[in-house]
């Protein structure tokens, strides 16, 4: 799929998602109170859809506890992000940090100036420059294709459904069994694993090498295997590598392909890599 076609497809998915959510609210209103409540619920749904389009990234940033960085705090990160964004002909993403000793990276927003890139303190302390460049390029590629727009809105809707059902009490726990699969179905219907392969391929081109991203993916995967991650699993699509354990409720929201397959595809872009690696 070409870049322009991918943008159009993702914009279509976004408006279908927002329209579907509004229609669902309208259906609830009709069941509860007929046409009068139907009109009110549809109107509220449209307002919520507009709010999601413009502010879903802020909701995500609040959920993960991110704060915006200034350039003096992480000058190399800003330099790398500016360089990669310029190569992709995109504005530099807004850069945020979460206090987490383990390497993690995620993005949220609409793309362009609405794109927020979040890194953990553990990633800044552990990643090599080429790895950091590869991860930034991967997320910029998502923003350029407007994958990020669909991922963010689907993630926020799913996360909100789960948070509502987790509020406590037997009724909310019952809702979890109903809303959990619904939120999962929404994400799987809109988010194909192919989007990750496409972003990986574009990132390799932006970096002139696939190996920085490949090494970074392995680093993130190893960290996930060593330490379990507590968070809202509906936000899984926003992370570069799935940080959640692949069991229980989190298993419903897996939209990333296996990391080992992603790394293998990246290494295959450099046919001589294995020979050079063995010689070294």
Describe the predicted segments one by one.
Residues 190-193, 257:
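Soluble non-cytosolic domains of exported or imported proteins
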Residues 105-129:
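Active-site scaffold of zinc-dependent metalloenzymes
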Residues 140-159, 168, 211:
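Catalytic Zn2+-binding segment of zinc metalloproteases
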Residues 34, 57, 81, 119, ...:
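Residue-level signature of catalytic and energy-coupling elements of molecular machines
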């Amino acid at each position: 799929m070409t870049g322009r076609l991918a943008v159009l497809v993702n914009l279509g998915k976004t408006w279908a998602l927002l329209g579907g959510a509004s229609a669902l609210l309208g259906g609830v209103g009709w069941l509860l109170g007929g046409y009068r409540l139907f009109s009110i619920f549809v109107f509220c749904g449209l307002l919520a859809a507009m709010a999601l389009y413009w502010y879903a990234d802020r909701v995500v940033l609040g959920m993960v506890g991110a704060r915006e960085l200034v350039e003096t705090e992480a000058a190399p990160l800003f330099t790398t992000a500016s360089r990669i964004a310029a190569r992709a002909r995109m504005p530099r993403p807004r850069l945020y940090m979460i206090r987490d000793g383990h390497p993690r990276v995620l993005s949220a927003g609409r793309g362009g100036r609405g794109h927020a890139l979040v890194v953990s303190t553990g990633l800044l302390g552990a990643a090599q420059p080429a790895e950091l460049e590869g991860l930034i390029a991967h997320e910029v590629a998502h923003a350029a294709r407007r994958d990020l727009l669909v991922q963010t809105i689907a993630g926020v809707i799913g996360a909100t459904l789960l948070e509502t059902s987790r509020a406590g009490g037997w009724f909310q726990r019952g809702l979890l069994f109903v809303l959990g699969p619904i939120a999962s179905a929404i994400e799987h219907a809109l988010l194909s694993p192919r989007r990750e392969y496409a972003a990986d391929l574009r990132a390799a081109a932006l970096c002139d090498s696939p190996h920085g991203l490949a090494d970074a993916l392995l680093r993130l995967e190893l960290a996930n295997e060593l330490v379990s991650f507590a968070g809202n699993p509906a936000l899984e699509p926003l992370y570069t590598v799935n940080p959640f354990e692949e069991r229980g409720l989190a298993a419903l929201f897996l939209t990333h392909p296996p990391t080992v397959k992603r790394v293998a595809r990246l290494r295959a872009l450099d046919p001589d890599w294995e020979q050079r690696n063995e010689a070294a």
